[in-house]
Amino acid sequence: MARVKRGVVARARHKKILKQAKGYYGARSRVYRVAFQAVIKAGQYAYRDRRQRKRQFRQLWIARINAAARQNGLSYSKFINGLKKASVEIDRKILADIAVFDKLAFSALVEKAKAALA
C-alpha cells in the first residue's frame, strides 16, 4: 500500500483557520493551535450573541417606550394593555421609533390607550 502524504490537505486546513483568525491579537492570529481554539470560541460567542441580540434590542425598545409613556403619564404595562384594548397592532420596534422621532404621534397613541383603559 502506498504511503499517503497529507501535507497539502493539512496546509489548506491550517490556511483556512489562520485566514479566519486574521486580525486576532498575537499568537491567536499566527499559531495554528491557538488560532483554532480562538476561532472555535469566536464561533460559540457569535452563535450565542445572535440570540442575545434579539433580547437586547427588545429590552432597548421596551425601555424607550416606557420612558416616553411615563412622560405622558402612563406606565409601560398600562400603555401596552391600553393599546391592546384599543386594537392598535404596532410592534415594539415601531413604537420605540415613534417614541424617539415623533413625540406628537406617540402622545396621540398614549391618549388612545388611556381612552381604551377608561
Swiss-Prot record:
InterPro entries for this protein: Ribosomal_bL20, RIBOSOMAL_L20_CS, Ribosomal_protein_bL20_C
Matching Gene3D superfamilies: 6.10.160.10, Ribosomal protein L20 (1.10.1900.20)
SS bonds (residue pairs): none
SUPFAM superfamilies referenced in this protein's UniProt entry, alphabetically: Ribosomal protein L20
GO CC annotation, single: ribonucleoprotein complex
One MF term in the entry's GO annotations: structural constituent of ribosome
Highest taxon above the source species: Bacteria
Single Gene Ontology BP annotation: translation
CDD domains named in the record: Ribosomal_L20
Keywords of the record: Ribonucleoprotein, Ribosomal protein, RNA-binding, rRNA-binding
Family the entry assigns: Belongs to the bacterial ribosomal protein bL20 family.
The protein's role, per its UniProt record: Binds directly to 23S ribosomal RNA and is necessary for the in vitro assembly process of the 50S ribosomal subunit. It is not involved in the protein synthesizing functions of that subunit.
HAMAP family on file: Ribosomal_bL20
Name recorded for this polypeptide: Large ribosomal subunit protein bL20
Organism listed in the record: Pectobacterium atrosepticum (strain SCRI 1043 / ATCC BAA-672) (Erwinia carotovora subsp. atroseptica)
Organism lineage: Bacteria, Pseudomonadati, Pseudomonadota, Gammaproteobacteria, Enterobacterales
Gene this protein is translated from: rplT
